[in-house]
UniProtKB/Swiss-Prot annotation:
It is a single-pass membrane protein. It comes from Human herpesvirus 6A (strain Uganda-1102) (HHV-6 variant A). Belongs to the herpesviridae immediate early glycoprotein family. Residues 1-21 form the signal peptide. The gene is U18. GO terms for cellular component: membrane. Pfam families: Herpes_UL37_2. The chain crosses the membrane at residues 262-282. This is Putative immediate early glycoprotein. It is found in: Membrane. Glycans are attached at residues 23, 55, 83, 120, 150, 156, 168, 212, 249.
Length: 293
C-alpha cells in the first residue's frame, strides 16, 4: 500500500470534513428603477463556506442544478409535509422554494402585493451542517425592518417574526403554509449545503451556482403587478407558472424588432419595384421613338 504524503493526507482530511462542516449563503437584492420604462435590477450573490460561488443576475441562478442536488438529500426523500408526498409534487416544491428565496421571486411578490412603494428589497438564505447542529435561516430586509424565519436543531421555529410593526401585513403572506419553509430550512437546506460543498471541493476552479449575466437589468411588463393579484404562497406547486413572466423576454423584443424590420424591408422592396417599373416604361418609350413607331 502506498504511503500517504502530507499533501494527500491534508486533502483527505479536508474532503472528509466536507460532510461535517458546510455553510451555504445566498443573498438577493432587487431594485426598481423608473426610467422611460420600469426596470428591475436583481442581483444574487452566493457563498460556500465564505468563498464566493457566484455573483450575477437573479435569473441566472442555476435552479436546475440546485434542485438536482437537493433531490439527493435524505430530507427530500423522506418529505411528507403539507400533503406533498409524490416525487412530482416534491420536485415542484423544490422548484418553487428555490425560485422564491434564491432568485428573488418572493421579493417581487411582496412588492406587488404588500409593498407598492418599495424601491428596493433584499433577502438572505443561510444553511449549515456541522458536527453539532444543522439548520437554516431566511431573512428579509425592508428599510429598517427585518423579518426572520429561523429553524435549526436548537430552535424550533413555528412562524416568521418581525422586529418591526409589520404595518404592511407582510407576515400574513409569509406565514401561509409556513410548515413548508420550516421543513426546507431544517431538513433539506442543511444537507443541500453539504452537497454543494462537496461539488465545490471536487471542482474548485470551475464551480459556480450562478451563470454570468452582463445585463442584470430587466424590463418589467406594464401588467406585472396585476399578474400577482390572485397569487397566494406556493400556488405554483399545483399550477406550473413561469417565474419570468414579469419580465419582457428576449423573444418578444426580437419579434417586435423583426416585425419592424420586415415592414421596412417590404416597404423598401415595393419602392424598388415601383422605380424599376417607372424606369422600364421610360426606357420603352425611348426605344419606340427611336424605331419610328
Amino acid at each position: 500500500m502506498k504511503k500517504l504524503t502530507m499533501e494527500s493526507l491534508s486533502v483527505y482530511i479536508f474532503v472528509m470534513g466536507v460532510c461535517f462542516t458546510s455553510n451555504f449563503t445566498c443573498e438577493q437584492k432587487i431594485v426598481l428603477i423608473q426610467e422611460h420604462k420600469l426596470r428591475s435590477i436583481c442581483i444574487s450573490t452566493c457563498y460556500v463556506n465564505g468563498v464566493l460561488a457566484g455573483n450575477s443576475s437573479c435569473v441566472s441562478v442555476k435552479t436546475s442544478y440546485l434542485i438536482n442536488l437537493a433531490m439527493l438529500t435524505n430530507g427530500f426523500k423522506a418529505m411528507r409535509v403539507g400533503n406533498i408526498t409524490s416525487i412530482s409534487e416534491k420536485t415542484a416544491f423544490l422548484r418553487v422554494i428555490i425560485n422564491y428565496y434564491f432568485r428573488g421571486v418572493m421579493l417581487r411578490a411582496l412588492i406587488a402585493q404588500r409593498l407598492p412603494n418599495a424601491a428596493n428589497l433584499s433577502s438572505t438564505v443561510n444553511c449549515w451542517l456541522d458536527d453539532h447542529s444543522a439548520g437554516g435561516v431566511m431573512t428579509l430586509f425592508y428599510g429598517t425592518e427585518r423579518i426572520v424565519l429561523n429553524s435549526s436543531t436548537e430552535i424550533n421555529a413555528s412562524r416568521w417574526i418581525s422586529d418591526g410593526q409589520d404595518a404592511n401585513g407582510t407576515l400574513n403572506i409569509l406565514n401561509e403554509r409556513v410548515s413548508l419553509d420550516i421543513y426546507f430550512l431544517s431538513k433539506i437546506c442543511p444537507q443541500l449545503s453539504s452537497e454543494i460543498y462537496k461539488k465545490k471541493v471536487a471542482h474548485p476552479k470551475y464551480f459556480s451556482l450562478i451563470k454570468n449575466d452582463t445585463k442584470p437589468k430587466k424590463f418589467l411588463r406594464n401588467t406585472w403587478r396585476s399578474a400577482w393579484s390572485n397569487w397566494y404562497k406556493y400556488k405554483e406547486i399545483k399550477e406550473f407558472l413561469d417565474f419570468s413572466s414579469d419580465y419582457e423576454n428576449f423573444s418578444e423584443i426580437t419579434y417586435s424588432m423583426s416585425a419592424a424590420g420586415l415592414f421596412f424591408l417590404a416597404g423598401g422592396a415595393f419602392t424598388m419595384l415601383l422605380l424599376l417599373c417607372c424606369l422600364s416604361m421610360i426606357t420603352r418609350k425611348h426605344i419606340v421613338k427611336d424605331l419610328g413607331y
